[in-house]
Amino acid sequence: MKGLLLRIIAAFALVLWAIDMVFPWQQMMRSEENRYNAIQQRGKLVVGTVNNPVSYFIGNEGQAGLEYELSRAFADYLGVELEMKAMDNGEQLFDALEDNEIDIAAANLLYQAKKAETFQLGPAYYSASWQLVYRKGESRPQSLSQIKDKLIIARGSELPLILQGYQTKYPNLKWQLENNQTQEELLLQVAQGKIKYTVANSIDVSAVQQVRPEIAVAFDVTDEASVHWYLPNNSYNELQAALLDFMNTALEGGLIARIEEKYFNHFSQFDYVDMRQYVQAINDILPKYAPLFDRYKGDLDWRLLAAIAYQESHWNENATSPTGVRGMMMLTKDTAERMKIADRTDAEQSIKAGSEYLHWLISQVPDSIPKEDRIWFALTGYNMGLGHMLDARRLTKNLGGDPDNWLDVKKNLPLLAEKRYYPNLKYGYARGYEAFQYVENIRRYMNSIINYYRVQENADNKDKPSETDENLPLPLTDNQEKQE
């Protein structure tokens, strides 16, 4: 009897201990489950981000950016509305996440070991690295040992900890944390020659190069690391489970690939000379013709129409080619007659006819193609003819791809010039590799116009002068005085 009593007491004590140990976990789970439930009850997902040319920005048609489109898709998956909250920097972003002001932090955020101890990670969806950048034309450093000036870096990442790790090897390495400037703004300061170096996310570097080609990469400071969304708490919860399912679907269904294609896949095509000439043309020539592009845009974005015109003629209304195409939009004589214009070298007539012809091509694209991709199929037809575009779709289907998926069709365009394929095509040989490059260039040119005006607007809205070196952003925190 005594033994039984002791066993009962011991069992009861074990139950109490187990409850004591499990209760905090239960509370934590309940708290995080309530976050998921709260999102459903309020009917709104709140996502924090940082303004930059890839993640999030306000365009002519409202909110845009990779993180915005992915967040919007996740909100749709949850069946709720989306609210985006833009922060000044990464530090504010993680403070807001810790204070439960936002449900998710999404801003092209690399994996950060220290943050992973405090917050929960969503699935990786692409990768990037930290790069040291300098102004093209200046002496290029080959390693951190050659950095004599203090590096100026933005707040809100684990970059200070990464640099601390290099101090054993490079004891003279120093840096300053910028309190008032974003990573993008520091990159622009490098381009302007106001600061010598900064270290930035490789995706953001490539994006800013599209409007400031003077920015050059010296070397990678780190290997590539995965990019994640960050969620509150570091334990499993319903919100993370929902995000995992959504991300898997987005990856397998091609949503993430399509968004990446839209915002940064064209970055690999960067050419310093071409981009420098283009940015100069945006500044000097585009203002003259922008009202015409806007007037005749129809259902298109005027900046897309402008990008097409630059690809065609470099905004030269008197342009001609040996093949007989002429004018701002480089129209053939037959197209000009079909669109009923008399003078192909008249900028207004050319832009109007080019836009009308492109709208007609879009109407000829099969209805099965998603709305956001129809323009790229139409531009392929604009460049090499509608029949060859349809051949590219048939070939893609024959090769096991999806003829309605632009990413699948795009990669097969060069095959239209290969002898093993074109004899079996309805419309025969075509320089598909040129059509491929044509569309890639237009996407790059369009994004450059968008970001050029966005950067200009941000600069105009800055409540500070920016013309002299005396106006370097202050205050700065020396890494020897305060480490993050």
From Swiss-Prot:
Membrane-spanning ranges: none
GO biological process terms, semicolon-separated: cell wall macromolecule catabolic process; cell wall organization; peptidoglycan catabolic process
Gene Ontology CC annotations of this record: cell outer membrane
Active-site residue numbers: E312
Highest taxon listed in the record's lineage: Bacteria
CDD domains attached to this UniProt entry: MLTF-like (cd13403), PBP2_YfhD_N (cd01009)
Region called Disordered, residue ranges: 459-484
Region of interest called Non-LT domain, as start-end residue ranges on this chain: 19-267
InterPro entries reported in the protein's UniProt record: Lysozyme-like_dom_sf (IPR023346), MltF (IPR023703), Solute-binding_3/MltF_N (IPR001638), Transglycosylase_SLT_dom_1 (IPR008258)
Subcellular localization(s) per the UniProt record: Cell outer membrane
Keyword Lyase in annotation: yes
Positions of the UniProt region annotated as LT domain: 268-484
Family according to the record: In the N-terminal section; belongs to the bacterial solute-binding protein 3 family. In the C-terminal section; belongs to the transglycosylase Slt family.
Function: Murein-degrading enzyme that degrades murein glycan strands and insoluble, high-molecular weight murein sacculi, with the concomitant formation of a 1,6-anhydromuramoyl product. Lytic transglycosylases (LTs) play an integral role in the metabolism of the peptidoglycan (PG) sacculus. Their lytic action creates space within the PG sacculus to allow for its expansion as well as for the insertion of various structures such as secretion systems and flagella.
Name of the protein described by the UniProt record: Membrane-bound lytic murein transglycosylase F
Annotated source species: Mannheimia succiniciproducens (strain KCTC 0769BP / MBEL55E)
Gene: mltF
